[in-house]
Amino acid sequence: MREIATEGLRRIEASLNYLAPTDERPVSYAYPPPLGVPWSTAREEAHTAPIYDLRPIARNISLDEAGFQLVSHRSAVENFWDEEELKRVYYPESVELLKQVTGATRVHIFDHTLRRRVAGVQDRAAGREVPRQPATRVHVDQTATSGVTRLQHAFPGEADELLRHRVAIVNVWRPIKSPVLDAPLAVCDARSVASDDLVASDLLYRDRRGETYNVSYSPRHRWFYVPEMRADEVLLLKCFDSAFHDVCDRGHNALIVKRCGR
């Protein structure tokens, strides 16, 4: 499949934090690590790249081709920081949205994350009293292995049967206040990413070992964002798809960095 054409699109220049070259498998913690152990062994390497305006071409971009899709959706949620309202209103909204866009017959929401940038604070290290911070490192939330593991964790005893059918993990990313002027989301056309650019990395939880992809830099990567993204705009990011053995080469993952700058 052809990559997204960028000729004529408005663009900005931004610094993206890629994985620095390494011979070791990176390890990161999803909880405070033991004393003296770093939150992550992954060293970052900044590269400046053009980030193109997605909005003018959004109608031509789909999950099954680029790994991401911009859709319109107005939520009835009044307070996204109200956990009860979020689960009572937003979860069902998201289920119906995903069914409508993907044609899925069954959708399960397994968790959510609220992020709000606080200047000078690093994600996770901030502690529970501070909101989760934008992820400033280029990454992919799931690998081909961890996607199956996530399914087994969410559906014990049922995962094997579910995998007889097509299963996908899709992030629903939206602003809870708009327009977004600080730390917008940037996504990469999955067709511009080679398998060798992806580095499987351990993500340690208290009760299990997860796996994500860190990403090595390539000038071939094609990045996009939605300028001043509105609360009625939603970016869908496909992290895993059981229909494909190599989700990157087949265009089914999104690479994320959330400090795109203007």
For each feature predicted by the language model, list its residue ranges.
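Non-heme Fe(II) oxygenase catalytic core, chiefly the N-lobe of the double-stranded beta-helix
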Residues: 2, 6-227
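Catalytic core of Fe(II)/2-oxoglutarate
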Residues: 213-262
